[in-house]
Amino acid sequence: MKPHEIERRQPQADRVEIVLSLDPALFWFRGHFAVQPLLPGVAQIDWAMHYATRLLAPGWRFHDIQNVKFQSPLLPGAIVTLTLTWQEVHQTLTFSYQRHDGETRHTASSGKIRLCR
């Protein structure tokens, strides 16, 4: 149920960038929607939490969503970069998904999630 990870960069201890390939065969695309499949927002949040709790904030878990904005759909076959930034002092995880269009990146979604122990 997770995407194929192409590359991972962690330029700082509290920040990670993960390049993902959205395989059209992913479970999340089935039935969402028949005419044009797209990656549901719940999957995007699930993946952000998956990587955050393993790479940046082990021992922390989901508390609530402070804000989230879905700006453009993520389609099957897309290459995207998931950027996660962890601010432990504020217990806040910031995430963004950027869709790759050649050398250009377009923000598809972003948000802030509050974590707790």
Residue ranges and their predicted role:
Residues H4, P11-R15, T85-R117:
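HotDog/MaoC-like acyl-thioester-processing domains
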Residues M1-L39:
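Catalytic strand-loop segment that frames the active site of acyl-thioester-processing enzymes
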